[in-house]
Amino acid sequence: MSVDIPPIPPAQDSARQNVTLQIVSVVLFTFIGYLTIGIPLAVLPGYVHDDLGYGSVLAGLVISVQYLATLLARPYAGRVIDGLGPKRAVLYGMAGSAASGLFMLLSVAFQGWPALSLASLLVGRLVLGAAESLVGSAAIGWGIGRVGAPHTAKVISWNGIASYGAIALGAPLGVLLVQWLGLWSMGAAIVLLGLLGFALAWPKLPAPLVHGERLPFHHVLGRVTPHGMGLALGAIGFGTIATFITLYYASRGWAHAVLCLSAFGGCFIGARLLFANSINRLGGFRVAIVCLGIESLGLLLLWSAPNPWIGLAGAALTGFGFSLVFPAFGVEAVNLVPASNRGAALGAYSLFVDLSLGVTGPLVGFVANLFGFRSIFLFACLAALSGLALAVALHRRSRRPG
């Protein structure tokens, strides 16, 4: 006797595919925006340190100042997203990305005058940071507005795939552009990408505005601060790899440092694709605890690596671990505010990763000056373990009655 097992209804399967397609069509703008961030990522520290002749602290600051600008722009970005809509925020962000490319072109033109070149570069990084504050959060808000709040974790996960995938692709692409065409090609590519993103966003239908009480930003910030602190501690590992992996490999006499950024991004994306639904099944705090533990192991591998291939494995493990930290804490944070304040909540929560990455450059550069480049990964590991301890505390608090 045989039993017929009914197949999954085509309508349900089609609905799932439709949700994913709608999300991907919006997080495409995050991919474009972060590609403009990834392209100069592996080149700028060496350019500032070797070509312009500045120290490791300034080399780190050139990367970190972008995140500081994003941090300062978050309140404004949240108001734009909630008040004018995510589409308008994406358009503003793409225009800013294109403008940042122009300042990078100026920096290359002034290469013979190091101070002027550095100043142009810093202004461009500030503009790019402000643009990032608009595009990243707006794409999440646009996606949630299109597919509904029950798919929040999925939207955040796909947005992360787009952002770190773009960084993983952009870093080696930037190196190749400089090798083939020269430094100017990075600025030109960023201008073109910003214009492309603007042109693609212009004809798309906007998400409906959610009406309701608008909480003051500092109230929203207060609600999401514990979750944001966990994210910030986990992000130090990524910031350390992104800013100093090229200088760390050079200090050890190793080649192919850019592969670490690609390994980090590739494993980050793989974990997001494989385990994104785990947040809905297990809860954000449980996922954050596991992920921060894995990230800590990866950073320990980088600290103790005897050769570049072990270092590469450490970067890959760090990317795998960090992959779900943002959505794991993020889902718990966004649930603390009304839907009409979703943009502000995303902006306030994301502010902590900006703060972390903004501080990481000069702080880790200072640690490197005192103890050598190898020590920075032990420092990042201790930060990730602190984030793990915070996630455990938040999880225990969430289970208390009342």
From Swiss-Prot:
Coiled coil: none annotated. It comes from the Bacteria. Gene3D superfamilies: MFS general substrate transporter like domains (1.20.1250.20). Disulfide bonds: none annotated. It is found in: Cell inner membrane. The chain crosses the membrane at residues 23-43, 52-72, 90-110, 121-141, 158-178, 180-200, 228-248, 255-275, 282-302, 309-329, 351-371, 375-395. Pfam families: MFS_1. CDD domains: MFS_YfcJ_like. One of its GO terms (molecular function) is transmembrane transporter activity. Keywords: Cell inner membrane, Cell membrane, Membrane, Transmembrane, Transmembrane helix, Transport. PROSITE patterns: MFS. Its main location: membrane. One of its GO terms (cellular component) is plasma membrane. It is a multi-pass membrane protein. Belongs to the major facilitator superfamily. YhhS family. This is Uncharacterized MFS-type transporter PSPA7_3302. It comes from Pseudomonas paraeruginosa (strain DSM 24068 / PA7) (Pseudomonas aeruginosa (strain PA7)). The lineage of its organism: Bacteria, Pseudomonadati, Pseudomonadota, Gammaproteobacteria, Pseudomonadales.
